[in-house]
Amino acid sequence: MKKYLIIFDLDGTVLPRLTVLDDRTVETMKAARAAGHIVCISSARPFAMSKWVYDRMGLDTAISTLNGAHIFHPTDAAFPEYDVSIPRELTKKIFDFCKENDSYPYYAERGDKLWYTDGIHNDYYTLHIEKADPLVEMPEDNDIGTGAARIIVNPATQELCDSLRAMVEATGELSFTEWHYTPSPVNGKSGIRVSIAPLAADKGYAMKHIAEFYGIPLEDCYAFGDLWNDFGMLRDAGHGHALKGSQAERESEAKYVTKYTCAECGVADIIEREILGIEK
């Protein structure tokens, strides 16, 4: 029997909402595991926010968190852990810029640890604050004592966002991703959010790292995702599937698109038909 690596994003891929996971998806992943396939999560979330999915699916495999900045196995010490971060001095420099320009809230993530500032926290970061272990208020001097695996910033204006981008990209070692949303009293005032991370944090690399450990060639990898942070693994997997209706369908180099959306269990549908051989 051919063994596949099934690697998937969480939010917008198998989770239509922050804490919603369909029973069909759970049972499909369990069936794939029972058939001898390797099932792995690759998420922007830290492990503390992903563990309920990991446990509900009954997983015992490696996991990629924080967009590939931290790749590890919760129970197998033989797995070669991968942990990258933004240098400490650059982390502080970015936070100093945010503080000087009234760009709140901003966050630093490393493992399950979260540093945060006061400000309007969206639903995702409200949940993150609840799950963080430990949760630490941002120091007054912005020096968290280590490098951040990921920084999230809410620039106060587009001009400040552009200035921050120029500063970050000038380092030559960090990625800068900007996205826009509709501002409101409960999700922020500017409508701009930014993710800053090491260039070495990449879900495509995470998939390769995990696949190598399990002895599975890339052509036998099934990858599923919906957003910009999934593009690398969707491009490099032999069976890269963008979720129907997603940014990944429009902009990624995924070879395939799911027949159904996240809310319609698009991932489960592919696994059932193509891997488990269940006729629909």
How would you describe each model-predicted region?
Residues 22-128:
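Active-site phosphate-binding/coordination module
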Residues 26-34, 99, 169, 208-212, ...:
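Surface-exposed amphipathic alpha-helices with a cationic face
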